[in-house]
Amino acid sequence: MTNAIAEGVRAAQKLSMQISGMQRQPVDISNYVMGIKCGGSDATSGLASNCVIGYVADKIVDLGGTVVFGETTEFIGAEHILARRGVTPEVGAKIFEKVAAMEARAKSLGCDMRKGQPTPGNIAGGLSSIEEKSLGAIVKSGTKPIQGVMEYADIVTDQKGLWIKDTPGREIEILTGMAATGAQCILSVSCTHLRAHE
């Protein structure tokens, strides 16, 4: 482990030296890619914090930028709402397909996503069902049409507007995936009081 840490420190120092002479430059917002994610949910998530992220997402899209959101597990029970926002029927069908595939993967491992949610922390925070949790989660995507569905390893090239990325909900995996997609910024909110219950 010590060697890995030392190598990481050396790599970071080398990168720091390489970029130290660079000057910041204005960049048009159309080149901006933002990832969005929410953490532990409670009864206020869909009423406050996720609404703010949704508002920001709409503004970025209006200005010509790209917004990518994921957490396919957080679509269960609300996938029909997201599907209606697809720019084509094919996009809507792809959303249903991704949710069904995720549920099938979980069931193959003995886990029923619809019966295991909401978590005890979500319930302590005032959520009563997986559908209620998902409705609060999808608010973070704003109101704009969904342009398409990206695979986990897909990179933003010339895509604009709002996109779904097929990702798990766990922080490490989704945040890594969003960064690899090309997101220069990832907005993530969580309800801290839930951590004691989960």
Regions found by a protein language model. Give the residues of each.
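Metallocofactor- and cofactor-centric catalytic cores in central/energy metabolism, strongly enriched
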Residues: 1-32, 42-51, 57-139, 143-147, ...
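Conserved small/polar residues in nucleotide/adenosyl-binding loops
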Residues: 192-198
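Short, hydrophobic beta-strand segments
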Residues: 36-40
